Amino acid sequence: GWTLNSAGYLLGPHAIDNHRSFNDKHGLA
């Protein structure tokens, strides 16, 4: 959980899903 996590929460579920996909691609999840 970092800055984008909070930003994604504020932007909405679409942003959260995009952020989760980003983490998965980089193995940060």
From Swiss-Prot:
GO terms for cellular component: extracellular space; secretory granule. GO terms for molecular function: galanin receptor binding; neuropeptide hormone activity. It is found in: Secreted. The keyword Cell cycle does not apply. The keyword Secreted applies. The modification Alanine amide is found at residue 29. InterPro entries: Galanin, Galanin_pre. PANTHER family: GALANIN, GALANIN PEPTIDES. Contracts smooth muscle of the gastrointestinal and genitourinary tract, regulates growth hormone release, modulates insulin release, and may be involved in the control of adrenal secretion. This is Galanin. The lineage of its organism: Eukaryota, Metazoa, Chordata, Craniata, Vertebrata. The gene is gal.
